[in-house]
Amino acid sequence: MTKTMLRALKGETLPTPPIWLMRQAGRYLPEYRATRAQAGDFLSLCYTPDLAAEVTLQPIRRYGFDAAILFADILLLPQALGADLWFETGEGPRMSTITDMAGVTALKGRDDIHETLAPVYETCRILARELPKETTFIGFAGMPWTVATYMIAGRGSKDQAAAHKLKDTDRPAFEALMDRVTEATIEYLAKQVEAGCEVVKLFDSWAGSLKGQDFEDFAVAPAKRIVSELKARFPGLPVIAFPREAGEGYIGFAEKTGADCVAIDNSVSPEWAAEKVQAGRTCVQGNLDPKYMVTGGEELVQATKRVVEAFRNGPHIFNLGHGITPEADPENVTLLVETIRGK
């Protein structure tokens, strides 16, 4: 097996960790901005296979990352389920809201999502053909809790108050929504794999707001269900889970869910994560602070070396603790890659 990313996901400790970055196709790259302008708007870019494939390939051409991640958005799935979705300039995504059981039952079934998502699958097929043979192709979806927070509130929020309120005041409606999203997520990811994705990543951006039993019920349990269902259909499929800001919840997350790798944010130190999460055997992904992609310089070099050193005694995929920001300097990414690969 020559793909370093797949070797790490199978538990191999490598002398140089494979590297890719969350949001590596993004606004910090001039070529991305040009392609997005050509598309007209963000959703058109997601739903135009040639252009979505192009922006996925751009950072691979520029940096030679070990993995490419499908260019899409976690909110395409709720849109395919029937939610209205739009993006407001400077404000981010907006959606129609679901506040009760009637809203849940009005959603489409899991087998009715594929017409809307067909362009995403076509993007996957293009990339499976065009990516370099050494580059691993990652598909992805949002985890049910995070997707549900947007569907309930109609927008992102810092505290996910609307979702917590529905969870605590109308548990049947909340659980029905989680079930509907979980089932659809399984079908969506299965289609991505059938179209050529070699790995899938589960993004639970707001997992950190789930505490105690809620974390077990609504972060761990849905992840376990999705992972087990996908692995039953696609034996050997590697899965990366990212329960962002889970803190102590990162410990044992891979074992509890069946994920092959747990991605870690930069709110925990690499040394803590190496001891408590990686423990010499569990593949971890992370966890450089994205700020260094803006600031650069010797600080970037030293922080990068610290992450590599912390995780060098077990399987590790180098990434950031969160997505690269639009303010990042493309030259700092070059410096990052050169530092890791010892050039």
UniProtKB/Swiss-Prot annotation:
CDD domains: URO-D. Its EC number is 4.1.1.37. It is found in: Cytoplasm. Substrate binds at R23, Q24, A25, G26, R27, D73, Y150, S205, H322. The record marks D73 as: Transition state stabilizer. InterPro entries: UROD/MetE-like_sf, Uroporphyrinogen_deCO2ase_HemE, Uroporphyrinogen_deCOase. It catalyses: uroporphyrinogen III + 4 H(+) = coproporphyrinogen III + 4 CO2. Pathway: Porphyrin-containing compound metabolism; protoporphyrin-IX biosynthesis; coproporphyrinogen-III from 5-aminolevulinate: step 4/4. One of its GO terms (cellular component) is cytosol. One of its GO terms (biological process) is protoporphyrinogen IX biosynthetic process from glutamate. One of its GO terms (molecular function) is uroporphyrinogen decarboxylase activity. The keyword Protein biosynthesis does not apply. Its main location: cytoplasm. The keyword Metal-binding does not apply. Homodimer. Belongs to the uroporphyrinogen decarboxylase family. This is Uroporphyrinogen decarboxylase. It comes from Cereibacter sphaeroides (strain KD131 / KCTC 12085) (Rhodobacter sphaeroides).
